[in-house]
């Protein structure tokens, strides 16, 4: 809740965020708390989680570091993530099979083992697609928070610009 005034001032959230936005913010705040020294720094890391999935603003430095394998990585990642189940169970369907460990395992198999790439090369296009930034909260946890549909939309959106 201490973040809200800063996010409102940055135009990321309104003064009256929905319960869904507050829930997502709680998850994102847990990811970024060790990556910022001051609350004023939170906006850049939080903003991508509230951007329209097909309109993530890709920073110039993030786009510049996309290597020649970016298209192959995005295609392989999309295929692997589409095959990953996204089923919900438990009280209020609060338990999901779309989890950071499952996402990480699928992506490592597809882009590191499958394409024979080093993690930095393999995950840079994915981080750029998900956050639009070179530096972001942890990738797999970010994908879990965003959900399967949003993650795939973001991968496709970046892919369509390459």
Cite the ranges covered by each PLM segment.
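Charged substrate- and nucleic-acid-binding regions of tRNA-handling and nucleotidyl-transfer enzymes
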Residues: 98-157, 161-162
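Small-residue-rich helix-loop
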Residues: 2-114
């Amino acid at each position: 809740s201490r973040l809200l005034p800063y996010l409102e001032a940055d135009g990321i959230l309104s003064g009256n965020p929905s319960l869904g936005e507050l829930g997502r913010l709680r998850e994102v705040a847990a990811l970024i708390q060790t990556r910022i020294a001051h609350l004023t720094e939170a906006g850049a890391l939080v903003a991508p989680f509230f951007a329209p999935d097909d309109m993530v603003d890709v920073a110039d430095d993030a786009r510049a570091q996309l290597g020649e394998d970016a298209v192959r990585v995005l295609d392989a990642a999309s295929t692997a993530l589409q095959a990953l189940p996204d089923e919900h169970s438990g009280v209020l369907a609060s338990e999901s099979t779309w989890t950071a460990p499952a996402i990480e395992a699928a992506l490592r198999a597809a882009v590191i083992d499958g394409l024979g790439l080093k993690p930095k090369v393999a995950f840079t296009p994915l981080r750029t697609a998900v956050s639009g930034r070179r530096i972001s909260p942890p990738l797999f946890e970010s994908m879990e928070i965003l959900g399967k549909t949003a993650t795939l939309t973001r991968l496709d959106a970046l892919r369509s610009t390459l």
